[in-house]
Amino acid sequence: MPAVRIVILAICCGLLLVPVRCCGPGRGPVGRRRYMRKLVPLHYKQFVPNVPEKTLGASGKSEGKIHRGSERFIELVPNYNPDIIFKDEEKTGADRLMTERCKDRVNALAISVMNMWPGVKLRVTEGWDEDGHHAHDSLHYEGRALDITTSDRDRNKYGMLARLAVEAGFDWVYYESKAHIHVSVKADNSLGVRSGGCFPGTAMVMMGTGERKPLSELKIGDTVYTTDETGQLITSVVLLFLHRNPYKTATFVLIEAEGHPSKLLVTPNHLLFIQSSSSAGFLPTFAYRVQIGDLVQIYVNGTQVQSSKVVRVSLEEQTGVYAPMTEHGTLLVDGVLTSCYATVESHTLAHVSLAPLRLFQGIASMLPDLDMSDGVHWYCHILYVLAKYVLWWDMP
């Protein structure tokens, strides 16, 4: 039996390297996914998200200054990216020091800047600070904040630079000064960084029988409702749980839609299908990007979903996280059409990456952990580790 398992696993891994057309989700549940998101520059003094920097919905609270001699100094890593210009006024290399998360985001932004303006590079004017030039709780003291410009110092570009920083995954972006853009990130050890994409156990799904059931009671093999590419209701089988932990406390984004009796709770890096004022259709979008006025797709009654405007977005903590995966990669949670996936802002890519698990669902009993075990599924953990190095510019 062990030999059989090894062979099966080898075949599954090999399939990831083969472009199998039938493994993809086709056009997806909401039409074609190839729209390019229109990038809208930030206005002077605008910040995204529209909450204070040190709140849960943004970069989170300060954890205290980091000094060269402190134990936490090892949390800072140097950034020698040749595509970034560091001003380094102090001539100490301090501006190159930052947290791992900040480094990932600024490296992603550097690529976006060169793609947007050929011949122009990203310029960091202020990074980690050890001289006390900022407010006492500034994230600059922790290597979690940067002040940035473009290498040509063209202030007409700064609004778009701020937008690119938002797209690169910075947790808070502020067009703070006409001389620079301020960006910051969550702490590397924060719950918002480490947690996967999930729903609370109290979230309700509609079963194929028509009854409603909380996710905490959902079982592998159950049939739930989702939609096809036209928005018509269809049923889909629950294949496994990508993440299941009834004891874990997580911060959820609470989304309330106009005329919809239920409220959706979802972790910040889970994918929802959203139409914003700057997009041409419904696109897979991280939950933390959702804003009032965006459109979601909801089910009220009848045989299909309808568009509804988001009227409220807030944060709420609950205990219990659940992430079921269906054969279609989508499902209705509390009446809102959602993706089963998180972490990478591409529903199609996530769906294709998990194709081996869907193809081999008939022999699931021969693979490890394809049951109701708690925690993150082993296959997803491997993909997440690989994605950190291959697709880091699209990850929260």
From Swiss-Prot:
Site (Cleavage): 197-198
UniProt-annotated binding residues for Ca(2+) 2: 90, 126, 129, 131
UniProt entry tagged with the keyword Endoplasmic reticulum: yes
Gene Ontology biological-process entries: cell fate specification; cell-cell signaling; intein-mediated protein splicing; positive regulation of smoothened signaling pathway; protein autoprocessing; regulation of gene expression; self proteolysis; smoothened signaling pathway
Binding site for Ca(2+) 1: 89-90, 95, 125-126
Involved in auto-cleavage (site feature) positions: 267
GO MF, any single term: patched binding
GO CC terms: endoplasmic reticulum membrane; extracellular space; Golgi membrane; plasma membrane
Tissue expression remark: Expressed in the marginal zone at early gastrulation. In the neurula, expression is restricted to anterior structures, encompassing both neural plate and endodermal cells. Expressed on the inner surface of the pharynx at the early tadpole stage.
EC numbers for this chain: 3.1.-.-
Signal sequence annotation: 1-22
InterPro entries reported in the protein's UniProt record: Hedgehog (IPR001657), Hedgehog_Hint (IPR001767), Hedgehog_sig/DD-Pept_Zn-bd_sf (IPR009045), Hedgehog_Signaling (IPR050387), Hedgehog_signalling_dom (IPR000320), Hint_dom_C (IPR003586), Hint_dom_N (IPR003587), Hint_dom_sf (IPR036844)
Lipid sites, type N-palmitoyl cysteine: 23
Record CDD domains: Hint
Residues flagged as site, Essential for auto-cleavage: 270
UniProt keywords, alphabetically: Autocatalytic cleavage, Calcium, Cell membrane, Developmental protein, Endoplasmic reticulum, Golgi apparatus, Hydrolase, Lipoprotein, Membrane, Metal-binding, Palmitate, Protease, Secreted, Signal, Transferase, Zinc
Disulfide bond entries: none
Assembly and oligomerization: Interacts with BOC and CDON. Interacts with HHIP.
Protein name: Desert hedgehog protein A
Organism (species): Xenopus laevis
Highest classification ranks of the organism: Eukaryota, Metazoa, Chordata, Craniata, Vertebrata
Gene symbol of the encoding locus: dhh-a
